[in-house]
Amino acid sequence: MRASGFFISTLKEAPAEAELISHKLMLRAGIIRRLGSGLYTWMPLGLKVLRKVENIVREEMDAAGALELLMPAVQPAELWRETGRWDVFGPQMLKIRDRHERDFCFGPTHEEVITDIARREIKSYRQLPLNFYQIQTKFRDEVRPRFGVMRAREFVMKDAYSFHTDIPSLEETYQAMHVAYCRIFDRLGLKFRPVKADTGAIGGSSSHEFHVLADSGEDAIAFCSDSDYAANVEMAESLPPAGLREAAAGEMQKVRTIAQKTCEEVAAYLNVSIEQTVKTLAVMANGGMHLLLLRGDHHLNETKVRKIPFLSDFRLASEEEIRTETGCLPGFIGPAGLSLPVIADLTVATMSNFVCGANEEDYHLVNVNFGRDLKEPDHVFDIRNVVSGDLSPDGKGKLEICRGIEVGHIFQLLTKYSEAMKANYLDESGQARPMEMGCYGIGVSRIVAAAIEQNHDERGIIFPAAMAPFQVVIIPIGLKKNAEVRAEAEKLYATLSSVGIEVLLDDRDDRPGVMFADMELIGIPHRVVVGERGLKEGNAEYRGRRDEKSEVVPLPEIADFIKSKLAGG
């Protein structure tokens, strides 16, 4: 491709609305252009990148035995009413009505549609298992679409759905999809981690997320560097503290802590470690108030709490509710002297001689011990977020916390949708049974933004080779003025193109500095400069996008040199 025949539209500065570095660079590089809130046009340069991601996804899905189809983007409300999701999915669903006043939605996901296809087409156990996928545009009406295509309202997604006679068959496909996803992200050249995750609103059983590692990631990931353990922080566990409680030291005392409400403030005021404080959270659930106890430096994990049956509908108690039950304000409540159910975190259950609220404004208790000064907790659960340094639950090291951008998610849905929509098959005995289902999604357009978040510098994008719009750019210096420069550049362009290498010949009539800046911004992995001075010495100049310096390569060797670089040499 010649730059003169391509559309390169770069910007010196990013528009003011861009916040994330990927959003800024995608706009500056001419990869996308904003049409409206959360709506973006993929420009020719960006579409080349997007298609490369799609192709790798498609190749690996095909290799894993999935079958591609394409479902309608617009879906009738009747299907969503069958599963009960029409009224509960929320305002993210864009609902529309046709000229006959019939309700439809622009699909945010396709569980209902694919299940409808399955119940119409699949009759016998002999037809199973089957795994269908599509790569299609979705729409979710985000409240505040931000960060460019990272969280756009309209986006490209690969969604797959599998159907099975039993759980072992589902697990086999689930593992095949897990392997396929790892291959996809490996081929794309991304640093990523698959992590155990919550099933969320889609529902079901097992669930794993795939995160591209990036400091700007919205999600916190806990992983062990000494093992394969990794989980989203909302699901991550750690080994509980070992050993028995220390013996009580001194009598419990009530001390005045005027205006010291947070554990940080109380610890500093009393000159004790924050690890020796306990914070008490009052929550309403199951028709009454419960007290949750956490170590002062730990944070509540709401996902874990909601998995406790009698706390599944919990909410934080209001100030008025707390005052009514305890007689004091939040910040000073504690478990002592109250008849409310107490749920302690595993870490708190082993503590002794701790500090907690005295249920009296401006007072705390010190040297508090379970069994002596207050009753043992009614229940002990893991209800906190893990932190760096916690022991990995597999006992093979300590946990570390990093940030990640979710780009893939796989679920075992079981029979949630097949039962609701009566998607049954006939087994060997002729009995109708609901199909077991799996669901497997990849944010195709989001991958591009995530890759840029992970791969950039002060000059622009550094695309992994598999995603770059072009593999090599040739920049001739003085192309219009020097026939020899033009001839050598054209010769190299023809040689590399003839063996299937994607080459961009920057034949624009522009200053070298502008061409260098544009190509670094766009993120093409390999650059060759052909100039008059180099030609006099029989050389070209090569520089990889990640390289700090250029290197001189003899002209007769430059084509083979580039081929070697592309082959990983």
Swiss-Prot record:
Task: List S-S links within the chain.
Answer: none
Enumerate the subcellular locations listed in this protein's record, separating them with semicolons. Cytoplasm
PROSITE patterns, A to Z? AA_TRNA_LIGASE_II
GO terms for MF:
aminoacyl-tRNA deacylase activity; ATP binding; proline-tRNA ligase activity
In which family does this protein belong, per the annotation?
Belongs to the class-II aminoacyl-tRNA synthetase family. ProS type 1 subfamily.
Instruction: List the HAMAP family.
Output: Pro_tRNA_synth_type1
- Write out the domain note: Consists of three domains: the N-terminal catalytic domain, the editing domain and the C-terminal anticodon-binding domain.
Write down what this protein is called.
Answer: Proline--tRNA ligase
Species assigned in the record: Nitrosospira multiformis (strain ATCC 25196 / NCIMB 11849 / C 71)
